[in-house]
């Protein structure tokens, strides 16, 4: 993850559902929703789930991308887990094909995408 901890696909099996949010540092709508996503993660944790962020500027361990992402997360009060991976993995190829940000997907315990991706910011005021 962005904090230097090892992560593998077992993180999905630990959760009833994992919400994965793809974002990047220069995306204003992405950064604007970081604090709301942190609130969503707290709600999900109470229901056996987790929200995970994937900043596409951190792929392959891009140090400057990671440093900037960590600053943005801290400035927005977002402490939920953010991970990166190599761009030549299945997840890396998926991230590389995203054309609209933020994009959010649901992952089941087996690491499968459930339903269609949600494009755009998450509005939690309607819940």
Segments the model singles out, each with a brief description of its role:
Residues 1-9:
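N-terminal "domain-start" segment that seeds a small globular fold
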Residues 8-31, 37, 50-55:
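Short active-site neighborhood of thiol/selenol oxidoreductases, capturing the structured segment around
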Residues 10, 115-118:
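Short hydrophobic alpha-helix segments
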Residues 14, 120-123:
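A short acidic/small-residue loop/turn micro-motif
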Residues 14-18, 45-52, 76-81, 109-112:
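Loop/turn elements at helix/coil->beta-strand transitions in domains of secreted/extracellular proteins
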Residues 31-75, 87-92:
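Structural microenvironment flanking redox-active thiols in thiol-disulfide oxidoreductases
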Residues 67-105, 109-110, 118:
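Short, internal strand/loop/helix patches
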């Amino acid at each position: 993850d962005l904090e230097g901890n090892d992560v593998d696909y077992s993180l999905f099996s630990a959760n009833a559902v994992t919400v994965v949010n793809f974002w990047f540092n220069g995306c204003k709508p992405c950064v604007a929703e970081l604090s709301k996503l942190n609130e969503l993660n707290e709600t999900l944790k109470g229901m056996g789930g987790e929200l995970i962020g994937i900043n596409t500027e951190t792929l392959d361990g891009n140090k400057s991308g990671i440093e900037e992402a960590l600053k943005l997360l801290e400035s927005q009060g977002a402490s939920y887990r953010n991970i990166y991976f190599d761009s030549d993995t299945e997840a890396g190829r998926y991230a590389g094909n995203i054309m609209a940000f933020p994009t959010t997907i649901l992952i089941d315990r087996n690491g499968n995408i459930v339903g269609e991706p949600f494009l755009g910011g998450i509005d939690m005021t309607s819940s």
